[in-house]
């Protein structure tokens, strides 16, 4: 029998169709010779299927449908949630962290539909209706181009994006011109003065301009890479800590020959007498006797100051944590004691302070054995008071600049941040312990920058440290508090760059003012520093989420500091330029008002948990306003006194009970106001008038008499107490707030009790009201 597959196929003898059941029955012997003979049609079908599935025919096979992805590349890589926001053009996470979002290139239709639904596209069409003249670019069919422009919303949207990108480009070019002017001015100055070589000056200019102006303009669907985003091909990943450094090898030899571990009972007993060991044992006894109190106070500190301390930390401690980390437990406890009302824990604080002081001072000798928790404790000693001002004769005031510098260097020595950088950027491993160490580093960096700038100890920051500070933004666990710290570091770095090249920066600001490029207008008459204004725009979204507005405190504080430094350091130049002096004074005054008004909006609970530096900013703003009180016209003087007195009222016993955290600041501000008012008895101010052109001349004459406190502009708030004691015999003093039920009654009595000489400051306003 012919068994060729091409043989004719005979139908079934019974005439029935070949059903599925029939085929399944014959499938058992499909591969046998017998099945091929009896059912040649099955062999033909099998051959057809084999030919269909052959590699030659795979090209005609329908491709497999690819699963649609709804998350961007960055969020998908870290496996986190991705919420696309059509109005912004990128997902929420990439927008907050300022990263490049791949959805910006794939969601054009969704963005356009959102604009249509919101009605924004109609507004764009009406605004850009006259842009139809662009049709002359297509000379072949102008009418067709015009009609398509009017009907197609996509074209209008593209024109809108083009206008937006052109506006952004113009702003970028304007800032570029400012940079070039600064470089040219600095180059001229360095050429005229042979103090430094031209290479050094150009390097300094690069630091102050290029480092502070880091262009981050966003346009359309393409986004220029932000500073916080890394390019792996441009990274400097070769940095590492030497495993066999010379001094480490010598230290290991010394440790082997003269071991620090005790080997005998006498040595163990002597080791227990070391100051650090004694301090730990003594605090452990205090903790065992007051365990519940320590847990309560530690929780109060962690909850009340959660906005200011390291983000993402614990909210309470337990026995195991306390025994493992005695130093930081003692710091939690003693800081919370200053938050208590009416000196509730004064007796316990007297006992606890010597123990904390010994633990803190002995960290210098325990440098090699410090842990991250110990360094975190030193950080909080920099940020908050651990001693009472009323007991200053027994309890020391520690220098926060020295402590923060020591803690920062200790952390860089103890933790290998080069390994962390390699894990995060190359291996993309996000370890919670690494995140904790980076958060300590960022908090220490922000604290050190604030105190170094405020103390006038200006130094250039390490570039590698800046790279470490940015690593937190790469973690999926990063939160709002981490963004706050990064923005604080960025602001401090900008201001630090300004003060490094202060003379050149002042010359550039003066040149911008003379050329009407100072960024102000006739209504506000405020000088806009381009670097600080850039920071404000760059972190605009983050500032909008900061309900308390605490970030703007430091922003206003640096404005006040820069303006006051201009007045004190370049007074001879400002004497010859009255308009620029008035502009700087007005800028300093408005930012002082902004800082004080922002403070008045804070709830009392947040004020009590605020760190020392926030209180320093508050006092400095009041001190500056009172120091330059007589440089303002009469109406502004009344506003200054009213606002400073409101701050004193806010910090006093009305609405809050007396406590260490707020009462001392209120006393300092009260002393500043009293001192500024008693100065009216000295000098000759009766000849003052409201002529703004003579403002600086009168102020300088008054300063020349040696009576104005502004003659010593570098005076710190700590000196105010001494000046206040010298003037304590004056008849005018701010009345006690306990005598009044409201601020209006208090301030009315305060104003009525002014001396006749003091009331002369406001006579012009009263006469004006009477005439009207």
Swiss-Prot record:
It is found in: Cytoplasm; Nucleus. Residues 72-101 bind DNA. Probable transcriptional activator involved in uracil catabolism. Keywords: Activator, Cytoplasm, Cytosine metabolism, DNA-binding, Metal-binding, Nucleotide metabolism, Nucleus, Transcription, Transcription regulation, Zinc. Residues 1-70 are annotated as: Disordered. The keyword DNA damage does not apply. It comes from the Eukaryota. The keyword Cytoplasm applies. The gene is URC2. Its main location: cytoplasm. CDD domains: GAL4. Pfam families: Zn_clus (PF00172). GO terms for molecular function: DNA-binding transcription factor activity, RNA polymerase II-specific; sequence-specific DNA binding; zinc ion binding. Present with 937 molecules/cell in log phase SD medium. Residues 39-51 have a biased composition (Basic and acidic residues). This is Uracil catabolism protein 2. Coiled coil: none annotated. Residues 59-69 have a biased composition (Basic residues). Belongs to the URC2 family.
